C-alpha cells in the first residue's frame, strides 16, 4: 500500500512539473503564448517518450480524455528525423490508439509513398492526444492545454523536418498568423524549446478528401519535402 502511494505521489509530481503548478493554480486567464511551459525528462529517447506518455495519461478534468476511449500518442520510427503533426484522433484512431489509421491515414500513407517515405521513416503524432467528440476541431483551450506536451514531444524527437498538416497544427506551432492555404508550401526554421527544425505546412489529408482539387498543391508541398530531405542528407 505504501509503495503504491509513493508511486502515485511520484507520478503526480512529474505531472505538475510538466504543466507547471503555478500555471495551473493561477487565477490569470489562459494565455496563447505558453512557450515557457516545458519539461526535461531524463533517460534514452524511448524512456523520455514513455514518461511523456505517462504524464499525458495523468491529465485530469479533461473533457477530451473523458469522452475518448484511448490515448493516441504516436506512431512510426522514434529514430526518424521527419515528424508529422496532425490535428487530433478520429474514431478509428481512438479505437486503435494509433494516429492516422482511418481513411485520412490511408491517404497520408499514399502521399508519403509518392516521395519514397513510409511509417518506418517518419514519426507521426497530433496536436491533441484524445479524440474530440464527433470528430470536431479541438477548441482553443484544448489546444493550449495539450501544447506543452506536444512541444515536449517535438523536443524529444528532435526532428530535422517537421510537417504540419492542417490549420490546427499550423496555428498550434506557428501561431495564428495566416490561413493554411497561404502558409502552405513555405519553409521556416523555428525554435521549439531546445530544437530548431525546418517546418513546412500542408493540407490535412481529411481536407484533401473533401477538396480533391487541392491535391495538386499538396503534391507541390510533398516535392518540397523530398528536396529538403536530399538537401539535409536525411
Residue ranges and their predicted role:
Residues 1-3:
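Short, small/acidic-rich helices and loops at N termini and domain boundaries
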Residues 7-11, 15-18, 22-234:
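A polyanion-binding, active-site-adjacent surface
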Amino acid at each position: 500500500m505504501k509503495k503504491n502511494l509513493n508511486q502515485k505521489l511520484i507520478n503526480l509530481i512529474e505531472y505538475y512539473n510538466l504543466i507547471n503548478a503555478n500555471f495551473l493554480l493561477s487565477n490569470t486567464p489562459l494565455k496563447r503564448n505558453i512557450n515557457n511551459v516545458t519539461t526535461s525528462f531524463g533517460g534514452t529517447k524511448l524512456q523520455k517518450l514513455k514518461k511523456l506518455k505517462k504524464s499525458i495519461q495523468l491529465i485530469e478534468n479533461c473533457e477530451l480524455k473523458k469522452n475518448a476511449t484511448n490515448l493516441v500518442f504516436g506512431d512510426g520510427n522514434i529514430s526518424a528525423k521527419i515528424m508529422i503533426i496532425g490535428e487530433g484522433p478520429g474514431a478509428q484512431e481512438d479505437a486503435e490508439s494509433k494516429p492516422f489509421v482511418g481513411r485520412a491515414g490511408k491517404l497520408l500513407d499514399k502521399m508519403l509513398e509518392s516521395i519514397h517515405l513510409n511509417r518506418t521513416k517518419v514519426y507521426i503524432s497530433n496536436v491533441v492526444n484524445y479524440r474530440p467528440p464527433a470528430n470536431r476541431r479541438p477548441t482553443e483551450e484544448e489546444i493550449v492545454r495539450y501544447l506543452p506536451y506536444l512541444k515536449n514531444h517535438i523536443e524529444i524527437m528532435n526532428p530535422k523536418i517537421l510537417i504540419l498538416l492542417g490549420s490546427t497544427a499550423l496555428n498550434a506551432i506557428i501561431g495564428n498568423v495566416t490561413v493554411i492555404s497561404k502558409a502552405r508550401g513555405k519553409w521556416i526554421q523555428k525554435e521549439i524549446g531546445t530544437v530548431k527544425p525546418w517546418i513546412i505546412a500542408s493540407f490535412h489529408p481529411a481536407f484533401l478528401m473533401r477538396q480533391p482539387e487541392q491535391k495538386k498543391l499538396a503534391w507541390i508541398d510533398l516535392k518540397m519535402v523530398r528536396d529538403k530531405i536530399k538537401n539535409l542528407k536525411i
